[in-house]
Amino acid sequence: SYSDIWKEYLIPSKCNDRGLVWSDIWIGKTLLFDFDSPKNPLWAFERADKVATHLTSEYGAECFVVFSGSKGFHVHVGLEDSRRLVGIDWEDYQDHKDPLKVIGQAHADKVVELASEAGVNYTTEDRSSNFRQGIVRCPYSIHPKTGQIVWPLDMKSIEKLRSKDNLTIEGVAKTIHRWDIPNQST
């Protein structure tokens, strides 16, 4: 099955059996913070903003805050900054039986630690996007449950959201991007 084949790409020895070099496929992993609050998305934003601000001011990290299109916000940390903050060199793990599992756990633990440094409790948040095969929606894609756009925030959008007291998911979307998309067929 495709699932079985995919699993073979996760393990260096299985890649080797297929004539592939594991380190050519897996080039890095980034830190990702996932903040959700279905009833109050601005609470999720405030926590994401606090973590991104902390990482930028304390570590000089390049961070991107993204509206998830649903319940909250993601903070993406750039690849080089993620490597530096986690302190893992992928080459040190390529001979491990399941390096992506070990590396993913290190990333998941680091988001809890860094959020705590920023004064944000992350112990109940979803850390799965940092695990071995963690995924998040791609910016500018459409969230299938809400129909909202997964939207990266620029400073103008961040400032607008900082000035709000309470918004629904739709209210967040209206605040950060236009709804009347030109040339869209009806």
Regions found by a protein language model. Give the residues of each.
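Helical (often loop-to-helix) elements that flank the catalytic cores of nucleotide-handling enzymes
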Residues: E8, K14, N40-E58, V77-T123, ...
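Accessory, usually C-terminal, subdomains that scaffold auxiliary metal cofactors
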Residues: E117, R127-V150
